[in-house]
Amino acid sequence: MDAITPESAAACYEAMLSTAAVEITMIGPSAGEAITGIFREAFRKALESRSRQPIDPDFDMEQKIPAEVRRVTEEMDLTQGKMVMGFSLLPAEDKKAQAVSRIATAIYGSSPFSKLFMNVREKLSLCYYCASRTMASYGYMLVDCGIESANQEKAEAEILHQLDEVCAGNFTETEMENARLAVVNSLRTVTDSLSAMSSWLLNEILQGGDSADPTDEIELTQAVTAEEVRDYMRSAKLSVVYLLAGPGKGE
């Protein structure tokens, strides 16, 4: 950030106008063709003086495994610390792999019955909150937690232990069924919100998908097996640990 200058920021902005791919989603009863024409004309007028060469999204589906874990600590005048652990994962190349990722994430850390919530948060009280989220197509997972800085090492160790538990297949059929129910319900409620539906459609565009209806994913979700969850999570490799701590507490 310190290296950014007004000139470099302006150059980046100019490059964005010339190369950025623009995707617009429209949800509602209006005629799509009429809306498309309005936006096309507006962008034509705004950018007609530029030589546009939009860059298509190009996802590298190779998993990035770091040579060593990067650790970053910053200090602020605060009481509650924050830790984020970043993991490299095998990118999900198709809808089936994405369904496996959703179930695995629900079991590990994105639900009220997850390993992280039930153990790191509830049983051991190492965090104020602890949850995971996965960007399956990009091949990464984040575990985000609020902690007392003094508990950082214990919390990190337990988060990794719970990952090991999932990788070993140490979860029950009840946990699998709860995960299926949670993910299916989440898919069904996407269409309840225009913003959620817009995000879904944009994600489909970026990933090269063609599913306009989130409920199309339900059958794949219900078919996910415990073995698939175990094998998927075994690809997780810790890449970075970020700690935001109070003054003198990050040492």
Tell me what each language-model feature is.
Residues 52-115, 244-245:
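His/Glu-based metal-binding/catalytic segments typifying zinc-dependent metallopeptidases
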Residues 119:
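Ligand/cofactor pocket segment of small-molecule handling proteins
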Residues 1-55, 91, 122-251:
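Charge-rich, well-structured scaffold segments of protease-associated domains
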